[in-house]
Amino acid sequence: MSKFKYNNTIKNQGIQTIFGLHSVKAALQNDKRELIELIISKNQINFDKKYETKIQKITILPQNEFTRRYGTNNTTQGVVLKTRDFSRPNLEEFVKIESKKSKSVILILDQVTDPQNIGSIMRSCALFDCEGIIVGKDNSPELTSSLYKSASGAAEIVNYIRVTNIRRAISYLKKNNYCCLLYTSPSPRDR
């Protein structure tokens, strides 16, 4: 028996770090989120003015301290938000909510493991009014800082639903009157 026990309920106390101007702005505007701390570099001093009423703790760091904490790469854009993620619906809850609408578009992805690809797809989904993305738990990334950054705010409005079995998810959607159009890329031997 291992002396190390992993308790996924404690994992990082549910605190997420979101960075980048668009991602942080979208998270600050999401009333479902519990906001913990907004950290900005002095170079982004005007950023906090708009959100002073939304968040209790705002920390303004000198540029050299901000760089020491968050790195020299430009991906943070001088803005970091510490927050707790909000409750996201599972497949059954999502279908129940969406069934009240006249139309609903869902994208199902399998074997897309790069968080930056998922983030890019989320941006496209937001543009085309796709309400959700369904992915397999074993072959997809969790919602991480890099996924939030590449989604550029779309992760706040597009539901990200991780399921154990995609085939069962498709069957469930069909039983709930969804028309499922499937595409798979050809295998190497089919080429």
In which residue ranges do the predicted regions lie?
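RNA substrate-binding interface of SAM-dependent RNA methyltransferases
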Residues: K96-L182
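Fold-independent oxyanion-binding glycine-rich loops
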Residues: L21, K42, R84, L109-V112, ...
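N-terminal positively charged helical leader segments and presequences
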Residues: M1-K100
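A generic structural signal for secondary-structure junctions
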Residues: Q29-K32, Y148, S152, R189
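Single conserved hydrophobic/aromatic residue that forms the stacking wall/gate
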Residues: Y183-R191
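Alpha-helix C-cap/termination motif
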Residues: N30-D31, K101, N176, S187
